[in-house]
Amino acid sequence: MATRTPDPKSTANGTAPAIDSVSKAIIEQLQEDGRRPYAAIGKAVGLSEAAVRQRVQKLLDQGVMQIVAVTDPLTLGFRRQAMVGVNVQGDIEPVADALAEMEEVDYVVVTAGSFDLLIEVVCEDDDHLLETINKRIRTLPGVRSTESFVYMKLRKQTYTWGTR
């Protein structure tokens, strides 16, 4: 099932959600350990467990953050990953939506630059990657061209960039 991530910079009325220093501190605590108990977070930021729980729920509801399990694709049998640049003829949105529906695609972003879209594809092996790109992505209506960047070695992946 494909989901569209809410724009973290806007709320239902189009304004940016207010993130105070305490909420930022809560986010940073969860970036260090997404399973950290609310009581421990409360101790670190000076709030009660209930207040932390309410703030976390509000941050989730506003689309400011998500709490998810991050897996290692290699340990799950997915031995080939690639970033694919996609150029589109016509409207980008239907192509982006179709790509987001694909099981192998875990990341879709509309870009400005050499490509209209960048997607990340996670596959079992080279044959699976070739089939996904050649038979599924390139055949989508509106796809003009693709360029693949196969991952050879992951050097850094982090979700702890803080709240700046």
Feature-to-residue mapping (PLM):
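A compositional/biophysical signature of low hydrophobicity enriched in polar/charged and small residues
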Residues: M1-R164
